[in-house]
């Protein structure tokens, strides 16, 4: 739905990898949608980080790093100060909210049976997913990583909708 109708609904649509003649149709391997307050400062960071992973293609056997794909988290790259968790306490930091995108991706991975090669839980519960389905990102030391276990490319579709306050991540096997 998002890839086909996103532009008509005022969102950035993902262009799926076109299958060559004789190729099989794309298969959704995992998908997840979470909700957020689109008026909160973290909404900006959710939108920026979703746009950075949107359309990324992971080749067979290649490892994807969420951190490397969205870095650097600076004001110059569009990230803003927003609430974060630090060692079990509430704080603020540049990029607060990006973990909702990494957590939504991790939940999509779980839904699709794609194992993480690196994943760290938050130090406090998150309100947008059940316990055990979150994936925190911090500095250059906490990352969400996975290897494309399929024999064809895997594409990430990530859409943050600031009107409805939802972020969706879909993993599509080509």
What kind of feature is each model-predicted range?
Residues 1-16:
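Charge-rich, low-complexity intrinsically disordered regions
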Residues 14-174:
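Well-ordered beta-sheet/strand-loop patches within structured domains
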